[in-house]
Amino acid sequence: MTLELYQHSLTLNTGEQTTLEQYKGKVLLIVNTASKCGFTPQYEGLEALYKKYHDKGFEILGFPCDQFGHQEPGSDEDIAQFCTLNFGVSFPLFKKTNVNGPDANPLFEALKNEAPGLLGSKRIKWNFTKFLVNAEGKVLKRYAPTIKPSSIDSDIAELLE
């Protein structure tokens, strides 16, 4: 997939249009998020990883999603405010998006194809599914929502060496 990954058009939660091209050459952790989920405290761990590795070429891209139990009901502005006030999130958040089904964000379709889940399933099962992408744009690994950000630290460190 590599180069194609960078062609995806995206909308930041501010409404600004962008592509993944601006993240070319960086290690990425792409996550579908939610504000009212049992895994929401993972924002704290994600922010810790971001602060630890951002200056070394690491980015976290957060994509709020309301497809799982309607646990992300707010507007993009509400979501950004919640994340900043409660968890100090400073990594980029994008417009609320779908990750499964006919209206799924094409980026997530590509991620799921490159890194299927358990038993080859491509569907994202819940909030805080994480995809690790190397600096060349290759999707290396998919992490289940139950995997805490701190458990991914060594994988990120290895890619940044």
PLM ranges: what are they?
Residues 1-161:
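Chalcogenol-based redox active-site neighborhoods
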